[in-house]
């Protein structure tokens, strides 16, 4: 008896191909989502660095003023009408500058610069003294990642002395 051997043909069925395609699609979708999350984190860190730079630029501008100009509320208000630097971040941040006598304050001079560039005088100190002042510069904004409120702040003490 001569029988021809029956060979089973190897191959994949349609459900196996569909499962493989779904696994591949999920894998690539995960990779793209991970990339998008990383880009959002990079954007958030850029915002934080821009805020830190904005605070430091404003602080340096105030620190380099003559003491009589620093204690003059109208001079500081005019100074705040322009942004601390030319970054795009300055257009969406709110700056608050507080100036008070140091070590014992007899009131606080406070200015707020909105994201639109409007400067308001929130309060004016009765006396800022003639030797030392404490300057607080704060920036607040809504973070692009998660739309959370964020802020950066720096405080410095400036004396009435000669500039070198």
Feature map (PLM): residue ranges:
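N-terminal secretory signal peptides that target proteins for export/translocation
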Residues: 1-7
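Low-complexity, Gly/Pro-rich coil/beta segments used as flexible assembly/activation regions
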Residues: 45-164
